[in-house]
Amino acid sequence: MRERRKIYEGKAKILFSFPDNPNLVTQHFKDDVTAYNNRKHSVIPGKGVINNYISAFFMQNLQNVGIKTHFVKVLNMREQLVKKAELIPIEVVIRNIVAGGLAKRLGLEEGMILDAPLIETYYKSDSLGDPMVTDDHILSFNWLKLSEIEEMKVMAWRINDFLSGALSSAGIILVDLKLEFGFYDDQIILIDEISPDTCRFWDTETKEKMDKDRFRRDLGGVSKYYREVARRLGILNGSF
């Protein structure tokens, strides 16, 4: 049997080749947690397992409502099989409530509800700190065509709408989320992950933070609240 090889290692995940099919890769979820462009780092045992299952849950449900994603299936507690997509170097952030970088950048009070979801785009580059870019930047540097930008944003809005509703029924507010996309078979698909690492989740009643802000802000209880998100979504089991 052919051995798999490491293709790429990021801050929170590793991609391995999938010898049985060159069009697929194995996505491995690490226990590492980072913030501020990797200037803050720790390891939280079990975090990768929780994020693997949470992301699989969201990806499967998004596919059920017609959103194309890279997800194929869960392989084990830490890994899932995904389509080998060509990365689009743009991160899409959708904000429903003022928090984090938006509050700091514009001097706004955290917790202010936006009249409509606000969409932002960032150039994906750790060395540059993922700078914000406009549609004109994206077009000027030929990262995407105008029709592709529009398609990506429509997908992002649909994802936000679906996740907001799903999380609301679990007593969780979707404050904001970061999405990544790629090309597969000449189509734009959702890639990467959807988890407390890539979203801001607040408890509906208490506004308690249930995401990576617990690590960023030294609030503690990262594992506890990640598990609580999984429990409320109905995917908590003995594996956790």
From Swiss-Prot:
The keyword Nucleotide-binding applies. Pathway: Purine metabolism; IMP biosynthesis via de novo pathway; 5-amino-1-(5-phospho-D-ribosyl)imidazole-4-carboxamide from 5-amino-1-(5-phospho-D-ribosyl)imidazole-4-carboxylate: step 1/2. InterPro entries: SAICAR_synt/ADE2_N, SAICAR_synt_PurC, SAICAR_synth, SAICAR_synthetase, SAICAR_synthetase_CS. Its EC number is 6.3.2.6. One of its GO terms (cellular component) is cytosol. It catalyses: 5-amino-1-(5-phospho-D-ribosyl)imidazole-4-carboxylate + L-aspartate + ATP = (2S)-2-[5-amino-1-(5-phospho-beta-D-ribosyl)imidazole-4-carboxamido]succinate + ADP + phosphate + 2 H(+). Coiled coil: none annotated. CDD domains: SAICAR_synt_PurC. Keywords: ATP-binding, Ligase, Nucleotide-binding, Purine biosynthesis. It is an enzyme of class 6 (ligase). It holds the Pfam family SAICAR_synt. The keyword Electron transport does not apply. One of its GO terms (molecular function) is ATP binding. One of its GO terms (biological process) is 'de novo' IMP biosynthetic process. PANTHER family: MULTIFUNCTIONAL PROTEIN ADE2, SI:DKEY-6E2.2. Belongs to the SAICAR synthetase family. This is Phosphoribosylaminoimidazole-succinocarboxamide synthase. It comes from Neorickettsia sennetsu (strain ATCC VR-367 / Miyayama). The gene is purC.
